[in-house]
Amino acid sequence: MAMKIDILTLFPEMFDIFNHSIIGRAIDKGILKIQSHNIRDYSMNKHKKVDDYPYGGGAGMVMTPQPIVDSIKDLKINNKGKVIFLGPRGKTFNQEIAKTLSKEKELIFICGHYEGIDERVYKYIDEEISLGDFVLTGGEMACIPVVDSICRLVPGVLSSSESYMEESFYNGLLEYPQYTRPECFEGENVPKVLLSGHHDNIRKWRRYKSLTITKTRRPDLFKQITLSKEDKKLLEIYSKE
């Protein structure tokens, strides 16, 4: 059965991006089903208006509750999944959240706009997710990478589970360096260990590189890692070379 994702947005055409590349192929194979729905279609306003001035004054406009709530209720008829709002007050999205959500069978995402949504909509929302401490033009900009990162973890989307298990963040570390042909480029050679054909040595080298890159570039992540005996030994051995 396909993982079903419904996206509520004012700009459904932005999600045509999912019809291409890896996600597009997964949709064609029936592994994923992603549909975007225009919130404006649910507006009872004769001009299909979906925003209004905030009570109490202030800059900008706020999305009105009626179209959003009605669209959620409509989708809930055939989608019993969590309702997730992309907003700045949510918990920061990361790989662990992606892994958790990739196990769901159905999900509904809401993309906000303007100065946000009417507070009374939140009782219909199960979870709020943020990409980080910065402001985007609209929730669509956040929804695309969130949905992409979730979908690629769904079994069958990638050709092999190893494709994502060795990527940055999946195991709490940043990814090791990658090399391809030519063997020498602008005087810089591919590390000899990668040409050796010795799989265990290659594994150890990659693990060491992941550890050192994470320690240097993301010390906050490195502090959360419980180093194994092998990790400690690798750091000791390679640091002497």
UniProtKB/Swiss-Prot annotation:
Transmembrane segments: none
A GO MF label: tRNA (guanine(37)-N1)-methyltransferase activity
Subcellular location: Cytoplasm
EC number: 2.1.1.228
Cellular component aspect of the GO annotation: cytosol
InterPro entries from the UniProt entry: Alpha/beta_knot_MTases, tRNA_m1G_MeTrfase_C_sf, tRNA_m1G_MeTrfase_TrmD, tRNA_m1G_MTases_N, tRNA_MeTrfase_TRMD/TRM10
Xref: Gene3D superfamilies: 3.40.1280.10, tRNA(m1g37)methyltransferase, domain 2
Pfam entry (one): tRNA_m1G_MT
Swiss-Prot/TrEMBL GO biological process terms: tRNA N1-guanine methylation
UniProt superkingdom: Bacteria
Keyword Cell wall biogenesis/degradation recorded: no
Signal peptide: none
Catalytic reaction annotation: guanosine(37) in tRNA + S-adenosyl-L-methionine = N(1)-methylguanosine(37) in tRNA + S-adenosyl-L-homocysteine + H(+)
Keyword terms, alphabetized: Cytoplasm, Methyltransferase, S-adenosyl-L-methionine, Transferase, tRNA processing
Binding site for S-adenosyl-L-methionine: 112, 131-136
Biological role: Specifically methylates guanosine-37 in various tRNAs.
Cross-referenced NCBIfam families: PRK00026.1, trmD
Protein family according to the UniProt entry: Belongs to the RNA methyltransferase TrmD family.
Subunit structure and binding partners: Homodimer.
The protein's name in its UniProt record: tRNA (guanine-N(1)-)-methyltransferase
Recorded name of the encoding gene: trmD
